[in-house]
């Protein structure tokens, strides 16, 4: 597990978290098995990606006036959750004075091609917890982190089967995005594991899409 040296952030990165064949098998399963939906934002336009939210009972939360209610875990996501928990460095919690608590929800994003994206944002909702782990499957897409001044702190196409963990004050000090890349024709799935802290108590945050 590599540590990305960015002042004010705490980031762990494993480029080869899943073997290629296993990552491809999981990608194909989730592509057809997840209950994908293309939601509309509070401003009535379609969010430019498909989403599926799975989690323990009570892990609902609200983002941009849209409530996410968890679907029941499917076996493949439960199995992956256990592996991601095992790979998450305990120091990610101890640096914050916390005991390891694992993940109780996952937001799955499907980018069907390079026209799908997620705008610059921070996962800074108080109920989301400070440690967020992301598994990438499928087409490599640019993942970019920017500081408060807009300066790029990290920019890399995350590989198929990679694990990227943001912890510490990363969400407070930085925003991240997956910009549009019209030349990308193939789909990408991103699985973002979280620990919902205040279960069942939604917030009302506006986000970029």
Segments predicted by a language model, with ranges:
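Non-heme Fe(II) oxygenase metal-center motifs and adjacent flexible, charged/small-residue loops
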Residues: 1-209
